[in-house]
Amino acid sequence: MDIASAEMTKYTANAMLATKISFMNEISNICERVGADVNKVRLGIGSDKRIGYSFIYPGCGYGGSCFPKDVQALIKTSKDFGYTTKILNAVEEVNFEQKHVIPRKVVERFGEDLTGKTFAIWGLAFKPDTDDMRQAAAITIINELTKRGAKVKAYDPKAEKEARVCYLKDNKNVEYCDSKYTVLVDADAMILVTEWKEFRQPDFIEIKKRLKNPVIFDGRNQFDAHSLSDKGFEYYQIGVSSKLNK
């Protein structure tokens, strides 16, 4: 393979995956508005072998270094050579907006002024099994909450140091905790941001006992809405109308 084609192959692979994520997040936003459940839509389209299930999970946006960097590299390279990208620009725009979906849901539930409210964050890294917080959704979510007067308590198995010394070092309204349960104490709601394995099957009785209000915002659609409703939780997902959640 020639050098130009090899470079394009690398950029295109990551841009394609980023596109799948943003596309599914776009669909999730439509689902919320028309009364559909994006989780069911995902299962339906994924059963088509031409599509499959890889990278079609809705969420609160992609981060890290590779996807953002390579999408931006293709956009810039195209511009340098006289071509204006359209799909890739939209991929970036959707991803930017998706990181604001959870804060908007919080505001819809608790109001624009979050003074006196505390939110427990599960997960800081842009994905599980890393301490990498580059362009992580948690940064946007936390900053959007604290600028409205909220306090945030955060827990991540690996990324706490990165948050403290770099990505959230100037945010004085963030408290870091040492476990997924201690972070919940006296919080008005829990927000799942990173789908770490240890968050997949938590003790919901313990969660309910520690939270002020049994309210969960799930940025990765990890939990079962009907089960949580039966346990007395208010549960807000990505791509599912709050009416369906209830």
Regions from the PLM with identified roles:
Residues 1-246:
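Structural/interface elements that position substrates and couple domains in central-metabolism enzymes
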